Swiss-Prot record:
It catalyses: orotidine 5'-phosphate + diphosphate = orotate + 5-phospho-alpha-D-ribose 1-diphosphate. HAMAP family: PyrE. Belongs to the purine/pyrimidine phosphoribosyltransferase family. PyrE subfamily. Catalyzes the transfer of a ribosyl phosphate group from 5-phosphoribose 1-diphosphate to orotate, leading to the formation of orotidine monophosphate (OMP). NCBIfam families: pyrE. It comes from Rhodopseudomonas palustris (strain BisB5). Homodimer. 5-phospho-alpha-D-ribose 1-diphosphate binds at residues 98-99, 102, 104, 128-136. Its EC number is 2.4.2.10. One of its GO terms (molecular function) is orotate phosphoribosyltransferase activity. This is Orotate phosphoribosyltransferase.
Amino acid sequence: MSKSASRARLADIIRNRSFGRGEITLASGRKSDFYFNLKPTMLDPEGAALLAELTYEALRDEQVDFIGGLEMGAVPLAGAIAQLSWLKNHPIAAFFVRKKPKEHGAKLAIEGLAKGESLAGKRCVIVEDVTTTGGSAIKAVEAVRESGAEIVLVLTMVDREEGATEAFAEAGLPFRSLYKASEFLNR
């Protein structure tokens, strides 16, 4: 399937499985009359494959070592992308950032790294399912930067177009999205 056909098919899947109308309170605390819940798309076999494919293609020239982000939205994405990158002979390892470090066991804030492995000096992409103001991704950026990694990009599947672009620009972070909310609202 061509990139444009993959993108169109994935938009259909998102529209049918993950987009809705109706009043909702977002993670940012804002109220909205539409929502994206990308979990049904990320956990659908075809949706997961297309998200991984399009994300992998978007990162192809970035020389990325790791991909991850804040739980829960980043977990299925990072895992699917890691698997596809291995199959494409260009491995990108995955991790995720806990919203709150575990209070037992290793008490880690960043999960997915082997014992003795570190993000220090690694080129990382922060990935997110849906971005409104960018607050969740910024939390992940802060944790990953604290570990010594370089953030090369913040990539979201759907940008709600409600301030994230400006917030990331202000923070000096490159930001891209696969889709914009207006692509779903204007149809």
